C-alpha cells in the first residue's frame, strides 16, 4: 500500500513539473506568411437617371397652405379618431362649446385671415397610403364651410423680456357639434384652404411637430351633472381634448425640368428620385474577398447644400417601364443594406459596403441598381443636384482577398 502511494506521488509531481514548464514557455507562430492581399478596386463608370413620383410629404413636421417660391399647397387635411366621443353620448353631459385649433410659429399672421375650414363625414385620405396626386382634385362643394378663424398670439411674459411662443388659429365648430359627437359618425375630416387667386401662405405645425401641446386638435368644453336629483345634483365643468390622428398637406406636383445631360436631382417636395447603375457583381472581386470599405463619392457643381441627407436603397428589380413620371414609386426597395449620408462641401460620400459584400456572398442577390432619395429629415423645400459627368465621381473599394 505504501509503495502504491509513493508511486502515485511521484507521478503527480512529474505532471505538475511538466505542466508548469509548458505554461512558462510562450508559443511563437510566424503570421507573416499568411497570403492575404489588401487591394483597391476603383470604379468610375457610374450612370443614372431621374424619375418622378407623387411627392411623399406625409410625416413632415409642418403643414402648408398657399404658395411659397415655386411650390403651391392646395390644402391641408386632417382626420380625427372615431373612438374618442363616447363621453358626450350621455344624457348627463351637455356640450357648451367646441373648437378646432391649429398652431403656427409665424407671429405675423393677421386677424381674420382668409384661411377657410371645411368639414366632411367622408373618408378622404389615409396619411400612410394616399397619394398626393389623388388628393389634388378633392371638390369642396359638398363640404360644410365653417369659415375663417380667430387669431391669438401667445406671448410669454414670465420674464422681464416678453417672448413670442406661438400663434393660435381657432374655429368655432359649434354648428357641427351634433354630427361630430355622434358615435355613428365614422369619419371626421377637416380641410384648410385658401380662396382661388389668393397669394397668402400659411405654415402650421403638424402632429409630428410636438408631443401633443401644439398638435392640431378639437377642444370640447362641457358640463356633467352628478346625482339623480336635479335640485341637489352637482355640475362639473370639464374640458376634453381630441388630438388629430392624421394630417397631410396637398401639393401641386412640379414636373422636373430638363436637368442637363447626365445630372440627377433629388427633392422631396418635387418627388424627384434617381436610379444609379454601378457595374459591380459577384465576379468583380476575387472569390472569398472581404470588403473593408466601399464608398461612393458624387460631386456637384456650384454651391454645396451642406447637411442635405440622401438615402440609398438597393433595388429588388427594375420595372419594365419606359416612363419617368409615376403616381406611386414602381422601384421596389430590397428592404436591406440601405444607408444614408449628408452632403458636405459639394460632395456626397455614402457607404455601399454592406450591400456589395452581400452581393459577393449571396448567389441569389444581383445588383440591379441603387435608388437615391431625399431623407425625411430634410427641409421639404430643399433639393440637391449631382453631376454624373464630374471627373471626381468614383466608387472606391478596399478589400482583402485570400
Residue locations for each model-derived region?
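Secreted, disulfide-rich extracellular signaling modules
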Residues: 2-6, 12, 19-402
